[in-house]
Amino acid sequence: MASNRGAGGSLYGGADPYRSREGLSTRNASGSEEIQLRIDPMHSDLDDEILGLHGQVRQLKNIAQEIGSEAKSQRDFLDELQMTLIRAQAGVKNNIRKLNLSIIRSGNNHIMHVVLFALLLFFILYMWSKMFKR
């Protein structure tokens, strides 16, 4: 590709440097460094394509804004949910502390009685299943 630039300064051989397949051509404007572009009339459907692309860009911009607002609302919801969870954890922790203090103050071993009853019940069920298993 670099070898094509040496002769005419163009990627397209001897063609104008800004010539493309869509009908763009250049000409020098009165000996200055300015370049004038002329679009061939047979390629006027490019304006329609450009308008269509503008519409698509506008749609994508709207979608991106909606995604951003949805992400913000989701983040706010998660923050609120996290605060609710923290408050609930604090409440549960406080209730467990109160329950432990109540158990210590009462001196009764109700929990120990429940655990022993459960162990005895499982032992009886185990022995019953062994006796009637043949």
Swiss-Prot record:
First and last residue of the signal peptide: none
Vesicular side: 132-134
Electron transport as UniProt keyword: no
SMART domains reported for this sequence: t_SNARE (SM00397)
Domain t-SNARE coiled-coil homology: 40-102
PROSITE patterns: T_SNARE
Protein topology in the membrane: Single-pass type IV membrane protein
Keywords attached to this entry: Coiled coil, Endoplasmic reticulum, ER-Golgi transport, Golgi apparatus, Membrane, Protein transport, Transmembrane, Transmembrane helix, Transport
Cited InterPro entries: T_SNARE_dom (IPR000727)
Gly residues bias locations: 1-12
Stretches assigned to the Cytoplasmic side: 1-110
Any one Gene Ontology BP term: regulation of response to osmotic stress
Regions crossing the membrane: 111-131
Annotated compartments: Golgi apparatus membrane; Endoplasmic reticulum membrane
Entry GO terms, CC: endoplasmic reticulum membrane; Golgi apparatus; Golgi cis cisterna; Golgi membrane
Endoplasmic reticulum is among the record's keywords: yes
Region Disordered, residue ranges: 1-31
Family indicated by similarity: Belongs to the BET1 family.
Record's function text: Required for vesicular transport from the ER to the Golgi complex. Functions as a SNARE associated with ER-derived vesicles.
Stated name of the protein: Bet1-like protein At1g29060
Organism, as annotated: Arabidopsis thaliana
